[in-house]
């Protein structure tokens, strides 16, 4: 009798079905399979958290992970666990989108923590394709900011449902009810549907892991948020019986398995080692590439868990496909149908990376050659599709690197610096476009939050940088929110000036808006540089007279070379300074005269400040230990001749 028992896939099963005896049983199996996968989909939610920088996205994910039981009782819990690299933790920003999953009751919730800075918006646009709804996180004091608008507009265009969470309601300067009005105005302004305007609203303190439906009475945990996700965000609407199809929305790179594709399965089922085909909607002439899914992973808490089979609606990662890019479609060989996707926004800012050729070249770096720098930049493009690296015409030691903004490129520079690379970079420059025969430049929507008595100064400074003043709104009784449309190049070097004008109390944020006709020449900075005229070691005597002419960037005992920028001066002209000048030795000494020389502590320049300070005739020397601003032409006489020739 055991030999007569039907076994799916067993010997003789095909004969059994062809004879008609197993048809009914096979149909029943297929029906049970569909019901089983439909039940799995009903217990699945895909959601992204979007907000502006430092509004608490990663902190909220931390709290969701803790309260869903991801951590063991004896496991050490790290704050902001989703910010996995040192730069993310130090700066308090998320750079690369992260995936995680929690289980609440019997429902699996895939959560994506997206970047909040506009420069990493290339990450956000792709991630929204993977989810069915979003959590819009807004600071109870700052309200919606430019990046909030940028991401929310794309989420609404995709028809996603929105859960509004007002965070940091325990801030002393919170203005909850004004922020609620601002969120509703933003939704109306972005043409949200009636259903989207009726979004549920919760009030939260992510730091304490508490939220509720009323700002006056919030609970002791995040249960209201979990319940709202289950009730309001729809389960994926997909077909598990159709041929396999998945759009690659994100990617990772591992030295052992190579490129890892991440995305949501749109339809069908995928098994380990299954044959697949890669195609692209925007490249229909491309020959489809055949591959094999050698490894499949689901997200579970903070980990990727290897699995044998995955079904439609789930967010997964897979390896085994060598050359794959964001926007590619992975599908079954018998149904090659590429999925449509919006191309990632093009870079707007470019810098030139080249071999360090200063007098101190090679002293501090581990990787200093053009080949090593080129290989590192090319590896970065495998992980960051918003980055573009191209050759510099006529040079074999320089590369043009284009990104979404100054922070995007500064993160790359800082990462390479920490890895031991030594190189030099040019000042950032905007990428111009020709539209209908007219030269156009990228424009930024700038929003600033400033003390009301500083508003006039800020408006005047932005106007001098060819910006347009769009709107002004009060924030309480002492602060104002100003909105501008300004050329991207008009913001180069402005942040330090802005902090000075607002006495350190201003907050500024910008996001790419559009391309507009070129607005003419614009000075990069309004101050001059103090430039070393000799090579050697700086001494107190040489710097003492220099500090009366401006602000120093270095102190005594620092190696300098001719052409190195050692400070700034209020005048627009550069001033040559001999920082190595020593006091002439004589037989006459006044008691205590040497002790009277006191230097003002030098201004410590961060990487972003150095990039903002750079003028067109300067470059930034980057080493693992030091940042040095220098003139392209080091010798003073040659530099003056070059200026006169112009």
Please give the residue ranges for each predicted region:
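Alpha-helical scaffold elements adjacent to nucleotide-binding pockets in ATP/GTP-utilizing enzyme cores
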Residues: 63-64, 101, 123-126, 130, ...
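Conserved Switch II/interswitch segment of TRAFAC-class P-loop GTPases
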Residues: 117-120, 129-149, 160-177
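Canonical P-loop GTPase G-domain recognition
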Residues: 172-230
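P-loop NTPase switch module centered on the Walker A-proximal segment
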Residues: 35-138, 142, 182, 251-254
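Accessory interaction regions appended to the cores of large information-processing enzymes
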Residues: 198-200, 220, 227-231, 258-261, ...
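Residue-level signature of catalytic and energy-coupling elements of molecular machines
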Residues: 54, 60, 92, 111-113, ...
């Amino acid at each position: 009798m055991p030999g007569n028992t039907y076994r799916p896939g067993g010997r003789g099963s095909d004969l059994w079905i062809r004879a008609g005896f197993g048809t009914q049983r096979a149909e029943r199996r297929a029906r049970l399979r569909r019901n089983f996968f439909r039940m799995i989909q009903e217990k699945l939610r895909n959601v992204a958290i979007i907000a502006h920088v430092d509004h608490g996205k990663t902190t909220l994910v931390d709290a969701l992970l803790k309260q869903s039981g991801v951590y063991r009782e004896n496991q050490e819990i790290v704050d902001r666990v989703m910010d996995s690299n040192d730069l993310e933790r130090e700066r308090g920003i998320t750079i690369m989108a992260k995936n995680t999953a929690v289980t609440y009751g019997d429902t699996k919730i895939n959560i994506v923590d997206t970047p909040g800075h506009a420069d990493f918006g290339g990450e956000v646009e792709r991630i929204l394709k993977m989810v069915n709804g979003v959590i819009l996180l807004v600071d109870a004091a700052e309200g919606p900011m430019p990046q909030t608008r940028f991401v929310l507009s794309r989420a609404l265009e995709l028809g996603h449902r929105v859960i509004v969470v007002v965070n940091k309601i325990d801030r002393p300067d919170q203005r909850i009810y004004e922020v609620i009005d601002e969120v509703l105005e933003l939704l109306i302004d972005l043409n949200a549907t009636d259903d989207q305007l009726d979004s549920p609203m919760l009030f939260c303190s992510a730091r304490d892991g508490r939220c509720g439906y009323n700002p006056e009475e919030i609970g002791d945990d995040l249960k209201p948020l979990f319940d709202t996700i289950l009730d309001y965000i729809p389960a994926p609407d997909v077909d598990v019986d159709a041929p396999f199809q998945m759009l690659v929305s994100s990617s990772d790179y591992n030295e052992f398995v190579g490129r890892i594709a991440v995305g949501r399965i749109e339809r069908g089922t995928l098994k380990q080692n299954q044959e697949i085909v890669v195609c692209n909607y925007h490249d229909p002439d491309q020959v489809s590439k055949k591959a094999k899914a050698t490894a499949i992973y689901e997200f579970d808490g903070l980990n990727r868990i290897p699995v044998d089979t995955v079904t439609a609606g789930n967010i997964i990662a897979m390896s085994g496909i060598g050359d794959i890019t964001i926007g590619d479609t992975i599908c079954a060989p018998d149904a090659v149908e590429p999925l449509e996707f919006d191309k990632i926004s093009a870079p707007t800012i470019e810098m030139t990376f080249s071999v360090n050729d200063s007098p101190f070249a090679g002293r501090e770096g581990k990787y200093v050659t053009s080949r090593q720098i080129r290989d590192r930049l090319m590896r970065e493009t495998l992980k960051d599709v918003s980055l573009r690296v191209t050759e510099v015409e006529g040079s074999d030691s320089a590369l043009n690197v284009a990104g979404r903004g100054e922070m995007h490129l500064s993160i790359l520079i800082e990462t390479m610096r920490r890895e031991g690379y030594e190189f030099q970079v040019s000042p950032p420059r905007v990428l111009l476009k020709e539209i209908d025969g007219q030269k156009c430049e990228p424009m930024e929507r700038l929003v600033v939050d400033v003390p009301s008595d500083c508003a006039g100064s800020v408006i005047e400074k932005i106007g001098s940088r060819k910006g347009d003043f769009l709107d002004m709104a009060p924030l309480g009784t002492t602060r104002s929110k100003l909105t501008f449309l300004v050329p991207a190049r008009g913001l180069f070097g402005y942040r330090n000036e802005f902090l000075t004008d607002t006495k350190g109390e201003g907050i500024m944020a910008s996001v790419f808006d559009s391309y507009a006709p070129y607005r003419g020449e614009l000075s990069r900075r309004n101050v001059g540089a103090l430039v070393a005229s000799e090579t050697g070691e700086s001494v107190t005597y040489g710097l003492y007279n220099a500090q009366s002419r401006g602000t120093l960037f270095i102190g005594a005992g620092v190696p300098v070379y001719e052409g190195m920028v050692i400070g700034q001066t209020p005048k627009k002209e550069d001033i040559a300074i001999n920082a190595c000048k020593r006091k002439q030795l004589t037989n006459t000494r006044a008691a205590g005269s040497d002790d009277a020389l006191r230097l003002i502590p030098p201004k410590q320049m961060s990487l972003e400040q150095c990039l903002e300070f750079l003028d067109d005739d300067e470059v930034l020397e980057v080493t693992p230990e030091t940042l040095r601003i220098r003139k392209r032409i080091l010798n003073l006489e040659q530099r003056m001749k070059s200026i006169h020739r112009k």
